[in-house]
């Protein structure tokens, strides 16, 4: 196992983790921004008001993007296990 192969595996793992987290984080960011704009427009300064819409939006995003996320993760793990004998020795 060379340092290059370890770096390659780590880089690929970080890319997959970023690809899995990005859609959910973007949905939470956009939902929070919309709720904050509505709170500023109506002058409602309740901090807990944005949590429920964010949770609902992220849950819907998981339902919609879940199969894609699962396929991406399974492809990565399948590739990792397939290449494991070549990486080890």
From Swiss-Prot:
Location of this chain's protein in the cell: Cell inner membrane; Bacterial flagellum basal body
Main location group: membrane
UniProt entry keywords in alphabetical sequence: Bacterial flagellum, Cell inner membrane, Cell membrane, Membrane, Transmembrane, Transmembrane helix
A cellular component term, taken from the record's GO annotations: bacterial-type flagellum
Bilayer topology: Multi-pass membrane protein
Keyword Lipid biosynthesis: no
Entry-linked Pfam families: Bac_export_3 (PF01313)
Lineage of the organism: Bacteria, Pseudomonadati, Pseudomonadota, Gammaproteobacteria, Enterobacterales
Naturally occurring in which organism (per UniProt): Escherichia coli (strain K12)
Function: Required for the assembly of the rivet at the earliest stage of flagellar biosynthesis.
GO biological process, one term: protein secretion by the type III secretion system
Segments passing through the bilayer: 16-40, 55-75
Protein name: Flagellar biosynthetic protein FliQ
NCBIfam families linked to this entry: fliQ
Protein family (similarity comment): Belongs to the FliQ/MopD/SpaQ family.
InterPro entries, per database record: Bac_export_3 (IPR002191), FliQ (IPR006305)
């Amino acid at each position: 196992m060379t340092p290059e192969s370890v770096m390659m595996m780590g880089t690929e793992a970080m890319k997959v983790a970023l690809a899995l987290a990005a859609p959910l984080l973007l949905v939470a960011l956009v939902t929070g921004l919309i709720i904050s704009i509505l709170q500023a427009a109506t002058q409602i300064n309740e901090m807990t008001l944005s949590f429920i819409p964010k949770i609902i939006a992220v849950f819907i995003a998981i339902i919609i993007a879940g199969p894609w996320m699962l396929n991406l993760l399974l492809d990565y793990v399948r590739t990792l296990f397939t290449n494991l004998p070549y990486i080890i020795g």
